[in-house]
A protein has these predicted regions:
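Short Gly/Thr-rich strand-loop-strand
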Residues: 107-142
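Mature extracytoplasmic domains of secretory-pathway proteins
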Residues: 88-119
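Positively charged n-region of N-terminal signal peptides that target proteins for export
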Residues: 1-4, 8
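C-terminal motif of bacterial Sec signal peptides marking the signal peptidase cleavage site
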Residues: 16-20
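A short, solvent-exposed beta-edge/loop patch
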Residues: 88, 130-172
Length: 191
């Protein structure tokens, strides 16, 4: 049975790889709103107190002045989609930014802005030691024109992996790049 399953999976993988070499490319876009809504449902993030559960984290949109004060310059980056969410209570670390930018250069600019936010919060901007620790583990992930900043006390790695998987379906880029605090200003290949 294991041999059959291995053979079947190998055949499917080979067909998938051969199909990818067909020369035709289709632009697929990841619906970042749907992606965020799935995360919100899965992890208990709500925006409406009336329909939220007892354990839900109340989230809000960061727009206008709030967006600019948290991520200076991000509003000036050309984006096709931009979702920026933060908890209503600052002691809770659960900031999520998802963006599809106009170009890979725009995405790199957005990633740099988001990394600046991570660094500032980890170096004391978050005030509380536990919050600063969570921020020090935050990730900025870029895949082609897609970029995300994920700063959560729980589910950090899971969300980053889900984003990388979703973004890879929406871009023809060869691989994701991510940067964690402490890696300086250089990008490293994601494993």
């Amino acid at each position: 049975m294991k041999k059959f399953l291995t053979l079947a999976l190998s055949a499917l993988l080979t067909m998938g790889l051969l199909t990818a070499c067909g020369g035709k490319t289709t632009d697929k876009t990841v619906d970042l709103t749907a992606f965020y809504n799935t995360l919100a449902e899965e992890y208990g993030w709500a925006e409406d107190a009336a329909s939220s559960g007892e354990e839900d984290i109340m989230m809000m949109n960061l727009e206008g002045d709030m967006l600019e004060s948290s991520y200076p310059g991000l509003a000036d980056v050309a984006t096709k989609q931009l979702i920026a969410k933060a908890p209503m209570i600052s002691a809770v670390v659960n900031e999520i930014v998802l963006a599809e930018c106009g170009t890979e250069e725009d995405a790199a600019t957005a990633a740099s802005i988001l990394q600046d936010r991570v660094d500032a919060q980890a170096e004391g901007g978050a005030w509380y030691p536990e919050s600063m620790e969570t921020w020090s583990n935050a990730q900025v992930v870029q895949n082609g024109t897609y970029v995300a900043m994920i700063a959560t006390a729980d589910h950090q790695e899971e969300i980053a992996e889900q984003f990388k998987e979703a973004a890879s379906r929406g871009t023809a880029a060869a691989g994701c790049v991510k940067r964690r605090r402490g890696e300086g200003r250089r990008w490293s290949s994601a494993a």
